Regions:
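Short, well-structured alpha-helical interface segments that form or flank functional binding sites
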Residues: 62-70, 98, 125, 129-132
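Charged, structured surface patches that assemble and position nucleic-acid processing machinery
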Residues: 161-207
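Active-site beta-strand-loop-beta-strand hairpin of nuclease catalytic cores
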Residues: 96-113
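Secondary-structure boundary elements
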Residues: 77-82, 107-110, 140-144
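Interdomain/boundary linker segments immediately adjacent to catalytic/signaling cores
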Residues: 10-79
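A broadly used, surface-exposed interaction patch
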Residues: 72, 76-98
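Catalytic cores of nucleic-acid endonucleases
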Residues: 116-175
Length: 207
């Protein structure tokens, strides 16, 4: 993994703050990530060793929650119609379910329900439960399509596509979602920003 010297990181951050096309990411994504507060690891092993460590898992979970908020903002700021701006909860079979993303695409007019996942490496039972939830929520919403959205992958690899397509579900990456709406940044700018600005922030928090 490439390590950038501290002064290099500072230069990149200053450059991005003054680069007009990055204003949107600075104003929307960065504050969400900066608001993450790591928790201490709750581990019997660490306790026995009398070691205090921050939970990297808590940081990743918080990142997943905030990146979901960010992409809802992106959808709202585009010409697509964000259907969950006022309410992202729905009753499904007696249970309250959270809606990650639900919008009508300006590109193809399709009503999409997307389940946001930063990781697709589930065990088989969790995959079944998650797939079932997507189909149930899609039906309750009356959406045309239910699918997974991975906000940290440019394009989904063929292995994951095949695995989920065989179960009747699609999986989309960032490039696909950006193609559905007019956005204020490109896919290259997004991933460069994650690497050069967001990564150092999360490292400083203990990731």
């Amino acid at each position: 993994m490439l390590r950038i010297p501290a002064m290099g990181i500072l230069f990149v951050i200053i450059l991005l703050y003054t680069f007009p096309t990055m204003d949107y990411l600075n104003e929307t994504l960065l504050p969400l990530i900066e608001s993450i507060t790591p928790r201490q690891s709750e581990s019997y092993t660490l306790s026995a060793l009398n070691l205090n460590r921050q939970s990297s898992q808590s940081i990743l979970i918080s990142f997943g929650e905030r990146i979901e908020q960010f992409w809802n903002k992106v959808i709202s700021d585009s010409n697509s119609l964000n259907l969950i701006e006022d309410n992202n909860l729905i009753e499904v079979n007696g249970k309250t379910r959270q809606i990650d993303h639900n919008f009508v695409s300006e590109e193809d007019g399709v009503n999409y329900y997307l389940e946001s996942k930063c990781n697709l490496n589930f065990d088989s039972e969790k995959i079944k439960a998650s797939n079932k939830k997507i189909n149930e929520v899609r039906e309750a919403l009356g959406a045309d399509e239910g699918a997974y959205f991975v906000p940290v992958v440019r394009e989904i690899n063929q292995k994951d596509l095949t695995k989920y397509n065989n179960k009747g579900l699609k999986v989309y990456g960032v490039e696909w979602l950006l193609n559905q709406s007019n956005t204020k940044f490109t896919v290259d700018e997004y991933f460069t920003y994650l690497e050069t600005v967001i990564a150092p922030v999360l490292e400083n928090k203990g990731l």
